[in-house]
């Protein structure tokens, strides 16, 4: 949250999606305590307006307003295409072996999303992880099948490159490790 607020002059409204808000949800198999709550957002917003979801461990170096104002071209979702995502065995040795829409950051047109997400009640009772069912329902890992539903946002909004800091190690002694911080160049 700090990095979002630090890098904007715009009003930001934040709703933390805490497990206590969803006490009846089946959460077996989730990767995090909040994995599938993100799909409740359109209904939580009354299927009106836009919403922006980010995982809580995201660090932002740019004003999120630039992402917020992204034109979704009439589509319900904006996401990054993760071309490195390894898919399950049924896609091995096919063009879909890698690649998936990444929901770590999503821009959502809540009204248009209504027909593509199940109700909160249905999601709460979902057997398995709703995330994977949702992603397959919108076309992942078949990118071309989902072009009418997902606007691809700039991959830099979900970057894992780690280029902002260098850690030169001079010794094997942990007490002697030097960490150098370099000024960030203008991002984008």
What are these regions (language model features)?
Residues 1-37, 44-48:
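N-terminal anchoring/stem segment of glycosyltransferases
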Residues 8-10, 15-18, 108-188:
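A glycosyltransferase accessory/donor-loop signature
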Residues 20-25, 85-86, 158-162:
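A short acidic, often aromatic-flanked loop/helix-cap motif at beta-alpha or helix-coil junctions
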Residues 28-33, 91-95, 167-171:
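Short, surface-exposed amphipathic charged segments that create phosphate/polyanion-binding patches used
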Residues 37-85, 107-110, 115:
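GT-A fold catalytic core of metal-dependent nucleotide-sugar glycosyltransferases
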Residues 71, 98-100, 172-173:
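Extracellular/periplasmic catalytic domains that process cell-envelope and extracellular macromolecules
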Residues 76-92, 96-100:
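Class I SAM-dependent methyltransferase SAM-binding "motif I" and its flanking Rossmann-like core
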Residues 99-103, 146:
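Short gly/pro-enriched beta-turn/loop segments at secondary-structure junctions
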